[in-house]
Each structure stands twice: as structure tokens, then as C-alpha cells.
Amino acid sequence: MQQFRFIDLFAGIGGFRLGLEAVGGVCVASAEIDQQAIKVYWQNWPTDGVDHNLGDITQIQQLPAHDVLVGGVPCQPWSIAGKNQAFDDPRGQLWADVIRLVQINQPKAFIFENVKGLVDPRNRLCLEIILDSFKDLGYSVFYKLLNSFDFGVAQNRDRVFIVGIQQKLDLNGFSFPEYAESDQRLYHILDNLEAPETKLESIPIQRNLFGERIEVGYNKLTPRGAFNDFFILNDIRNGPTSIHSWEIYPTTEREKHICMIIMRNRRNSRYGNCDGNPMSYSDIAELVVDLAENELQILVKKRILRQYPDGKYEFFNRRLSGGIDGTYRIFMPNARFFGTLTARGMHDEIAEINVSGANAAEYKYNFIQQVLIPKRYRPITVSEAARLQGFPSTFKFHSNQSANFRLIGNSVAPPVIVALGKRLQCVKLFEQELCEV
């Protein structure tokens, strides 16, 4: 394995560095302005008396000699349309600074990461501007949406990776890494979770006639008729994974019926043009036989419904991601993955025990009775979040726990970077004379 030098832009806590050092990389400098991230970074890579943090990239021109430039470029709100407006947002302007640094310093290769919204069809023009800018600088450019789950990380985390190689050096042709199979479950990774009584087989990768991977939705029931990996606590959708507040709080069968009627009709266009619309008493009375308005008021007191000043009713928990009582999803210990860790925090928790059932309805009922009502679930810890992101147990974090969740959520998953680094090694970029370390 050849050594190579790299510079870590938007370094955060060092996710890129961990990955590239595992495949022969030597970090010659980093750039970061978040003071909490800087503290964690230097706890894990102490300085030798020299500050190698380049600071604000908007103020940088010439970089130290390096072979590969990497970074998780902060995302802009990817809803901008039009070439002349694509980088008006200050966060979008950072892409222009990255392109400028590539132009000035001409690294042999680069790897940049961004949120999956960058490849949304609505943002196609923004993506094309970025790709074309690199191509105009003489680079072969490749991009792909990669999920950390496919690289041994027990997290459903989609991110866009843009890889560039100087055209004159891309002699062997770069290709993105293959997916890796894994039979790990959350009870293997998180602390003090109950293992299932029977061994769960790994789910094989399925391919079509052309050898291409057949993608499986992460929010669908697992193959072979297995029960779902998690439950969603919400009042605005229905399905085998959904649990509603009226199934948790003490309610009569009549009250449950009223709530289901409202849930099934609130998206009807006759009540408004939103995805979900408040409904008046008369609207609901047309759908529920012999409805008394006092019945709705009781549901308001139970914090299942809310009433607006105009008299219309809506669910108290009206936002899907807000969940119920602050919890959105509860994952089972035998789940293959956890929800996406984000810098803004999350409302996902982990069940402490497994449940079983003869069918989906019994499985759901047992979950409510054995996990949900007795509150046998909890948030994940910082060390667990780090493991779910692919950080080693020896990694040192900040003393501020809330800061740690933000920093981990902002980081790239090191195992994905390891896989990308290996692919760069396969191109044999670092056998050239420019790569003297």
C-alpha cells in the first residue's frame, strides 16, 4: 500500500482522517473553524507544537504540498434554481471556495461529501455546475449516492460523494467500491440490549440479470416475511409500522374510531390544499355517526387533538418527524440499522428488549404492551452514536455531551472513507513521483 499526503478541509472531528489514515494516508494539514470540533480533533491527533489547522478556507490560497484534497462541504439549502443564484447562499459559496482551491493547488485527486439533497432532480443544475467546474480544471469526475449501511455501518445514512482524479493520471479508471454484506444487528453494537432467542440470518444482496444490486427500501418490512425493524410513533400515517397516540393513551373504542376517521380524511383536498388539513366539527360530524362536539373536546384534553382559534381540529402530534412525546421511531435490538444521525439531533430511540408475535397485529400489540407503555426504550448514548457512525471505541470526545451528538452527526462515516481510499489506491495514483511522503 502506497503512502499519500492529504489535506482535510471542513475537518470536523476527523472522520475523513480516520478513514484515509487506515489506507496509507498522511494528513499534512486540516481546516476547521468550529472550536468544539477543533478541540476533539486535536485530542485525537495532538499537535507537535505546530498548529496545522489552516482555519477559514475562504481566506486560504496556497495549500501545503499534498496529493489528495478531501472534505465534507457544508450543505446549502438545496432548493435554489438558476445558474446565477446557485451559490448565492453563504454555505453554497463554500463550494466556490473548494473549486478555487482545487484550481490553485491541483491535487492529484479529491473526495468531497455532501447531503443526498444535492442529487435531487430539483437541484440538478447545482450539481452540474459543481461537476462541470471540476471537469473544466482537467479532472475526471465521478459521483454517487452511497449509504453507510452498505459499508458495515449500522446506520441508514445516504450521502453524496464526488471523486475527482486528474485526467492525465486516471489511467486505470476509477470506480466506486462494491457493497459489503453484513449480518450485524444493533444488539451487537449498542449496550445492554437483549439478543433474540433465535439466530437471525444475514440478508443476502440480491442482483438483477446484469449483476446490478437490487436496492431494498430501508423503511419496508424485511425480506422473508420478517417483522419490521422499528415502529414509527405518529398520528398522521397508518401502516404495519405505525403506532398512534390513541393506541398508547387510555381511550375508548369510540375515541379510537374517531381518531382513525380524522387521520384517513385529513389529507382530502376538500378540507384544504395541504398534506394534512385541520377539520371543523361539521366536517368530522359528516364522517362520524352521532358525533357530539364534546367528544372532540375530550380528545383535546387528552392531548390527542388540538383546537385552533378558528374552531378547527388537528392532531396534537401533527408533524411526522416530531413523533409522540418527543419520540419518532423506536428500533428493535435485532434491527440491522439505526436512523440517520444528524447535527440537529434526532427523535429515534432503541428498545431494550425484543418482542415476538404470531402475526403482525400481535407483534405490534406486544410491542405496545411490553416496550412502549412500560417505557422499556431509551435514547442512544454518545459512545453508541460514535459506534453507529463507525468511530473506534478509543476515540476521545468532548466533555459537552450535546456537542458530541452534533459533532458526530456532522461527521462522515470513516468506513465509507476507507472503502473510497482503497479505490484510489487501486487506480495506482500514488506510485507517481508527486507522492513522496
UniProtKB/Swiss-Prot annotation:
InterPro entries assigned: C5-Methyltransferase, C5_DNA_meth_AS, C5_MeTfrase, C5_meth_CS, SAM-dependent_MTases_sf
Catalytic reactions on record: a 2'-deoxycytidine in DNA + S-adenosyl-L-methionine = a 5-methyl-2'-deoxycytidine in DNA + S-adenosyl-L-homocysteine + H(+)
Keywords assigned by UniProt, alphabetized: DNA-binding, Methyltransferase, Restriction system, S-adenosyl-L-methionine, Transferase
Catalytic residues of the enzyme: C75
EC number: 2.1.1.37
A molecular-function term among this protein's GO annotations: DNA binding
Keyword Transferase: yes
Gene3D superfamilies: DNA Methylase, subunit A, domain 2, Vaccinia Virus protein VP39
The protein's enzyme class: transferase
Role: A methylase that recognizes the double-stranded sequence 5'-GGWCC-3', methylates C-? on both strands, and protects the DNA from cleavage by the HgiEI endonuclease. This system is more active than isoschizomeric RM.HgiBI.
PANTHER family, alphabetized: CYTOSINE-SPECIFIC METHYLTRANSFERASE, DNA (CYTOSINE-5)-METHYLTRANSFERASE 1
Protein's recorded name: Type II methylase M.HgiEI
Lineage: Bacteria, Bacillati, Chloroflexota, Chloroflexia, Herpetosiphonales
